[in-house]
Curated annotation (Swiss-Prot):
A GO cellular component annotation in the UniProt record: cytoplasm
Cofactor(s) the protein requires to work: Mg(2+)
Database matches in SMART domains: DSRM, RIBOc
Protein's UniProt name: Ribonuclease 3
GO molecular function: double-stranded RNA binding; metal ion binding; ribonuclease III activity; rRNA binding
E.C. no: 3.1.26.3
Species this chain originates from: Wolbachia pipientis subsp. Culex pipiens (strain wPip)
Catalytic residues (positions): D51, E123
UniProt subunit comment: Homodimer.
Membrane spanning residue stretches: none
Length: 230
C-alpha cells in the first residue's frame, strides 16, 4: 500500500498518512473485503462523505468566483460541476481507474473504465483526503481540478430536464412524464432505463448508472427530436 500511496500521490498531488483510508477509498464493493471486526471494507461510506464535501467546496468556490450571480444561476453551475459525468471525467483525467481495486469479474467486465465506478471512487478519494488531511487539503485538490471547469462555463448551464419542462410550458402542453422502464445489473453497479413522454411525440428512453442521469439523457434525446420537427 505504501507503493500505491507513492504512485497515486504523484497523480493527485497529495500523500496519505493513513494507508488504510486510502485503501478503503480505492476498494470496489466486488472485492468483498472485511476488516478485523468483520465489517465490509469498500469505498461506499467514503463515497457518501466525499459527495457532501465536493458539493460544499464547489459551492464556496462558485460563491467567490461569481459574486454578481443570483442563487438560481449558481445552483445551475453547481449542478453541472458535481454531476456524475463531470466527476467521472475528472477521474478519467487523473487515470483513477488504474488504481481501483476490484475482483477479476468486475475487471473483465470493464470495471476500471465504468463511469459509475470512476465517479464513486473519486468521491470516495475526496472523502478520504478530507479525513486524512482535513478541509484545506481537500479544498486544494478539488479547486485544482474543478476551478478550470467552472471557468469554462461562460453562462449558467440549462439542464435538459429544465429545458424540456420550459418548452412544454411555453407551448401550453402537459409537463413531461418520466417512468422507470427497468433496472438491471448488480446492486453495486446498476443500470436504469428511463422513458419520457410528452404530448404529440413518441416516448423516448435512455439508460444510465443513475435515475437522475437517465432522465437527463432521455430529456436530451426528446429535445433533439423536437428540434428536428420544429
Amino acid at each position: 500500500m505504501r507503493v500505491l500511496n507513492d504512485t497515486i500521490s504523484k497523480v493527485i498531488n497529495y500523500k496519505f498518512t493513513d494507508y488504510a483510508i486510502l485503501e478503503e477509498a480505492l476498494t470496489h464493493p466486488s472485492v468483498n473485503k472485511r476488516n478485523s471486526e468483520d465489517q465490509v471494507v469498500s469505498y461506499e461510506r467514503l463515497e457518501f462523505l466525499g459527495d457532501s464535501v465536493l458539493n460544499m467546496v464547489v459551492s464556496v468556490m462558485l460563491f467567490k468566483m461569481f459574486p454578481e450571480e443570483k442563487e438560481g444561476a449558481l445552483a445551475k453551475r453547481k449542478t453541472d460541476l458535481v454531476c456524475g459525468s463531470t466527476i467521472a471525467n475528472v477521474a478519467k483525467e487523473i487515470e483513477l481507474g488504474n488504481f481501483i481495486i476490484m475482483n477479476n469479474s468486475e475487471r473483465c467486465n470493464g470495471g476500471k473504465c465504468n463511469l459509475k465506478n470512476l465517479e464513486n471512487s473519486l468521491e470516495a478519494l475526496i472523502g478520504a483526503i478530507y479525513i486524512d488531511g482535513g478541509l484545506e487539503s481537500v479544498e486544494k485538490f478539488i479547486i485544482r481540478h474543478w476551478e478550470k471547469l467552472a471557468k469554462d462555463i461562460l453562462d449558467p448551464p440549462q439542464d435538459p430536464k429544465t429545458s424540456l419542462q420550459e418548452w412544454t410550458q411555453r407551448n401550453k402542453l402537459p409537463l413531461p412524464k418520466y417512468e422507470l422502464v427497468k433496472q438491471t445489473g448488480p446492486a453495486h453497479n446498476p443500470e436504469f432505463t428511463i422513458s419520457v413522454c410528452i404530448e404529440s411525440y413518441d416516448k423516448v428512453s435512455a439508460c444510465a448508472p443513475s435515475k437522475k442521469i437517465a432522465e437527463q439523457k432521455a430529456a436530451e434525446l426528446i429535445l433533439e427530436k423536437i428540434k428536428k420537427t420544429t
